[in-house]
UniProtKB/Swiss-Prot annotation:
<dbReference type="GO" id="GO:0045892">
    <property type="term" value="P:negative regulation of DNA-templated transcription"/>
</dbReference>
<feature type="region of interest" description="Disordered">
    <location>
        <begin position="1"/>
        <end position="130"/>
    </location>
</feature>
<comment type="function">
    <text>Chromatin-associated protein which contributes to the modulation of chromatin structure (such as super-helical structure of DNA) and function. Binds to chromatin of protein-coding genes throughout the genome to regulate nucleosome occupancy and chromatin accessibility, and to modulate the expression of target genes.</text>
</comment>
<feature type="domain" description="DEK-C">
    <location>
        <begin position="426"/>
        <end position="481"/>
    </location>
</feature>
<feature type="DNA-binding region">
    <location>
        <begin position="473"/>
        <end position="477"/>
    </location>
</feature>
<dbReference type="Pfam" id="PF08766">
    <property type="entry name" value="DEK_C"/>
</dbReference>
<feature type="coiled-coil region">
    <location>
        <begin position="492"/>
        <end position="527"/>
    </location>
</feature>
<keyword id="KW-0539">Nucleus</keyword>
<feature type="compositionally biased region" description="Polar residues">
    <location>
        <begin position="374"/>
        <end position="384"/>
    </location>
</feature>
<feature type="compositionally biased region" description="Basic and acidic residues">
    <location>
        <begin position="516"/>
        <end position="530"/>
    </location>
</feature>
<feature type="compositionally biased region" description="Basic and acidic residues">
    <location>
        <begin position="387"/>
        <end position="397"/>
    </location>
</feature>
<feature type="compositionally biased region" description="Basic and acidic residues">
    <location>
        <begin position="57"/>
        <end position="68"/>
    </location>
</feature>
<feature type="compositionally biased region" description="Acidic residues">
    <location>
        <begin position="286"/>
        <end position="332"/>
    </location>
</feature>
<feature type="compositionally biased region" description="Basic and acidic residues">
    <location>
        <begin position="1"/>
        <end position="47"/>
    </location>
</feature>
<feature type="compositionally biased region" description="Basic and acidic residues">
    <location>
        <begin position="83"/>
        <end position="93"/>
    </location>
</feature>
<dbReference type="GO" id="GO:0003682">
    <property type="term" value="F:chromatin binding"/>
</dbReference>
<keyword id="KW-0156">Chromatin regulator</keyword>
């Protein structure tokens, strides 16, 4: 309101000043007029007086008005000062008196650099000593912990053991230091019940993982969740070793075994599986030192009940395969003997039947007998020859299929043998052939095996020949083939001799028949004469 009154009164204050400004030029004009118009001085004086009177009256009015304005302005200033002090004190709370709507002022929030509140450092887990051995001192548990990452399973196990979570870096270390629950005697039952509840809340898969980490023996197929929970709780009360077998040593032994096997498979990948198995058998008697090392490794490996050892079934399969190979060799040795006996029997039967069936009937029967004897001789010789050819071809194929690796092994073994003792040189192929032919004449083919002949050869020469087993096999087949050839030649000669005898017998029979016929004719002639 004070501001409005001031604005209204300001033009009244300024108005007399304008009038005064206008008064001065009028007086000057009047003086000039008096000078110009001297005759009109009287009139001018009168007018002047009138003007002066009017001016005085106006000045009086203006003076009064100025005084009133000054008083009002002073009052307004005082009011403004009072209202200004009040407004300054009550700026935020007082609403404006005007009818126009106004928004309330927002409070100014001053920026202040406040130091950030640091989170209190997490208390390190206090690990008390329990009744059992620390988990890091149990070799199998330490080995399995070292191979695992600090995943959710280990974090859960940590919370069960210590009742707190920890950083991923500290989880495995803390679990390794755990040596059992340190319960007070008074609260032992309560604390056991709490931990049992925590373990029961876990899923069966989690409990199986705990058993694996803590090296607790379980059968995964038939185990129930309750049994797993009981076993885990019993172990955690007083941890200790569950078995004597150390997994780390076992894995090292497996690595030793796997490295040479990989080399073998890489070298002889093109060779057939049967030949590989035969080479394994050949290497068994010669590599005694390697066999001992592998045997020790196998003995360590078989102690583990949880992990399946592949060594034992492999050895059994190798033995079975070697037995089958020996049986095959026996069959091959028995075949030529059967051939010999069958050929002899057929020749004897043919000769015997021919000797017995002497009919004094006609020449046709004799000719048919000769033809049949020739056919039998041919038939006996032809299957023997076919079998011989097949046998030679099979031996050639076997020699071709034999991998280059056994030869290399044989050379290595030869080197070992020469290093051990260079007393006797190994026999040549010709020498072996001569001795084998002698042995085959003495040996019974129905019972003899390749290993028996090989043993006799090694005894004869005083040298171990197991690494030359394929070569010995070829030598035996050669000797058998030579023997069968000789026997076939003998049989052919015997057959030819038998056929000559038969021819002579037939001729004698024919002559006898002729003589009998002539004698009969003579008798018939003599009878009518009588």
């Amino acid at each position: 309101m004070a501001t409005e009154t001031l604005d209204e009164k300001t033009p009244e204050v300024n108005s007399p000043a304008k009038e005064e400004i206008d008064v001065v030029p009028k007086e000057e004009k009047e003086v000039e007029k008096e000078k110009v118009d001297s005759p009109r001085i009287g009139e001018a004086e009168e007018e002047k007086k009138e003007d002066e009177e009017e001016g005085e009256a106006k000045e009086g009015e203006l003076g009064e008005k100025d005084k009133e304005d000054d008083v009002e302005s002073e009052e307004e200033e005082e009011e403004e000062e009072g209202s200004g002090s009040k407004k300054s004190s009550e700026k935020e709370t007082v609403t404006p008196t005007s009818e126009r709507p106004t928004r309330e002022r927002k409070k100014v929030e001053r920026f202040s650099l406040s130091t950030p509140m640091r989170a209190p450092p997490s208390k390190s887990v206090s690990i008390e000593k329990g009744r059992g051995t620390p988990l890091r001192e149990i070799p199998n548990v330490a080995h399995k912990l070292s191979k695992r990452k600090a995943d959710d399973n280990l974090m859960l196990l940590h919370t069960i053991l210590f009742g707190k979570k920890a950083k991923a870096q500290m989880v495995k270390r803390n679990i390794g230091q755990f040596s059992g629950f340190a319960w007070s005697e008074k609260e032992e039952e309560k604390q056991r019940a709490r931990i049992k509840e925590k373990i029961d809340k876990c899923v069966k898969e989690k409990l199986i993982v705990f058993c694996d980490v803590l090296d607790i023996p379980i059968s995964r197929s038939n185990v129930k969740k309750e049994e797993l929970a009981v076993k885990v709780l019993e172990f955690l009360e007083s941890p200790k070793e569950t078995r004597d077998v150390i997994i780390a040593d076992q894995e090292k032994a497996k690595k030793r075994k796997s490295t040479p096997k990989r080399g073998k498979s890489g070298e002889s990948s093109d060779t057939p599986a049967k030949r590989k198995r035969q080479t394994k058998k050949r290497d068994l008697p010669s590599d005694t030192e390697e066999g001992k090392d592998e045997g020790d490794a196998d003995s360590e490996g078989t102690n583990d009940p949880h992990e399946e050892d592949d060594a034992a079934p492999e050895e059994e399969s190798d033995h079975e395969k070697t037995d089958t190979d020996d049986e095959k060799d026996e069959v091959e040795v028995e075949k030529p003997s059967k051939k010999k006996s069958s050929s002899k029997k057929t020749v004897e039967e043919s000769s015997g039947s021919k000797g017995k069936d002497k009919q004094p009937s006609a020449k046709g029967s004799a000719r048919s007998g000769e033809k049949s004897s020739k056919q039998i001789a041919k038939s006996t010789s032809s299957p023997a020859k076919k079998q011989k050819v097949d046998h030679v071809e099979s031996s050639k194929e076997k020699s071709k299929k034999q991998p280059s690796k056994p030869q290399a092994k044989g050379s290595k073994e030869k080197g070992k043998a020469t290093k051990k003792g260079k007393a006797k040189a190994e026999p040549t192929r010709k020498e072996m052939l001569e001795v084998v032919s002698k042995i085959l004449k003495e040996v019974d083919f129905n019972t003899a095996t390749l290993s028996d002949i090989l043993q006799k050869l090694s005894d004869h020469f005083g040298v171990e020949l197991s690494h030359r087993k394929p070569e010995v096999k070829d030598v035996i087949t050669e000797a058998i083939n030579a023997m069968t050839d000789d026997e076939e030649e003998d049989e052919e000669e015997e057959a030819e001799a038998g056929s000559d005898k038969e021819k002579e017998e037939v001729k004698g029979e024919e002559e006898e028949e002729k003589a009998e016929a002539e004698s009969d004719k003579e008798k018939e002639k003599e009878e009518p004469k009588d």
